[in-house]
A protein has these predicted regions:
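N-terminal, charge-rich interaction modules
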Residues: 1-26
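Short amphipathic alpha-helical segments
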Residues: 23, 27, 31, 70-74
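Charged interaction segments
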Residues: 68-146
């Protein structure tokens, strides 16, 4: 990963998303434990095993963060370890830069394994909500279901 990108101040410099099928939940949990043991400076993110939720991530996954801004210097070590130990899972490693979510999850991202179809439209909805737009689908305000 390009470590010279303009990273966002005050945010984790990079995220790791490990995607898994529902029947591989235990195997994914084992990978997460190994990842945390090997890189104890990573921060634990969310565990989302509910596919179909309104999210840019189309399938179950767990997330880890490079917590400290200095951790960006170590991201390529994590990527190399994951290449050897990913256990067949599709993994997305992306920076959090001033370029925004769409570019961070596409142009600047590193995929290990088969890429999954990121739902980029969700980022656009999230941006609309941030700037105060209220979008409705049927009788539901988008703000209430994200």
């Amino acid at each position: 990963m390009d470590t010279s990108l303009p990273f966002l101040a005050g945010k984790n410099p990079f995220d790791i998303h490990v995607y898994f099928e529902a029947n591989d939940k235990e195997k994914a949990a084992t990978l997460k434990r190994k990842l945390m043991a090997r890189f104890d400076w990573l921060k634990e993110g969310r565990w989302n095993d509910r596919a179909g939720r309104i999210s840019p991530h189309p399938m179950p996954m767990f997330e880890m963060f490079g917590g400290d801004p200095k951790s960006i210097a170590k991201v390529n070590d994590v990527i190399e370890w994951l290449k050897k130990n990913r256990g067949g899972f599709s993994i997305l490693v992306h920076p959090n830069t001033t370029y925004g979510n769409v570019k961070d999850h596409s142009v600047h991202a590193v995929w290990l394994g088969e890429p999954v179809g990121i739902r980029f439209w969700v980022f656009h909805i999230q941006t609309a909500i941030k700037i105060g737009l209220v979008l409705t689908i049927g009788t539901y305000a988008i703000r209430s279901i994200l």
